[in-house]
């Protein structure tokens, strides 16, 4: 499961994965600008200021980008392996976007998925459970703030992606 992955992943085995940076985030946010803003005919959108604000927010969070992140850890990429036991029964596919990044990234993919409507209370309990059962060095409030900043970035990107699909 996601907690086992975070607690047992050895970074030495992940040396071929790149660390997530603001440049990666900017590429993702560009989907919002390109497809959502410009397709909605908003020519007055302050693109440079938008990226500057996101850059400021990103660096103010002081992320500890030292954990494995699948990045597309959604239910459609998980499957049941009946011949295994415990956490090994959860098979995971679709690794092409994996990187070294924020501890809670895959939790964001699961809980903040706009196609699945968990209650905020349910999500909050699962976030706290994840935090309490992983080796996160940040205090809980810092982790939570980082979680929500990256969740917002993900939702912003998805607005662009969905707008593109409607074009």
Regions found by a protein language model. Give the residues of each.
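A cross-family kinase active-site recognition segment
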Residues: 1-44, 64-66, 90, 99
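Conserved short hydrophobic patches within well-ordered secondary structure
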Residues: 9, 70-71, 159
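Active-site activation/catalytic loop segments of kinase-like enzymes and analogous catalytic loops
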Residues: 30-40, 100-137, 152-167
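Central P-loop NTPase core of STAND/AAA+ ATPases
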Residues: 43-53
């Amino acid at each position: 499961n996601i907690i086992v992955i975070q607690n047992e992943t050895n970074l030495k085995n992940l040396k071929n994965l790149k660390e997530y940076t603001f440049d990666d985030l900017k590429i993702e946010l560009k989907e919002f600008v390109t497809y959502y803003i410009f397709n909605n005919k908003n020519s007055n959108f302050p693109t440079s200021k938008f990226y500057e604000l996101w850059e400021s927010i990103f660096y103010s969070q002081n992320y500890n980008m030292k954990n494995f992140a699948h990045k597309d850890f959604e239910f459609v990429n998980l499957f049941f392996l009946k011949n295994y036991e415990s956490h090994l029964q959860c098979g995971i596919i679709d690794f092409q976007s994996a990187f070294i990044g924020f501890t809670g990234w895959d939790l964001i993919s699961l809980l903040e998925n706009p196609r699945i409507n968990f209650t905020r209370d349910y999500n909050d309990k699962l976030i706290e459970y994840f935090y309490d059962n992983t080796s996160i060095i940040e205090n809980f409030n810092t982790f939570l703030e980082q979680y929500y900043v990256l969740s917002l970035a993900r939702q912003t990107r998805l607005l662009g992606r969905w707008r593109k699909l409607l074009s």
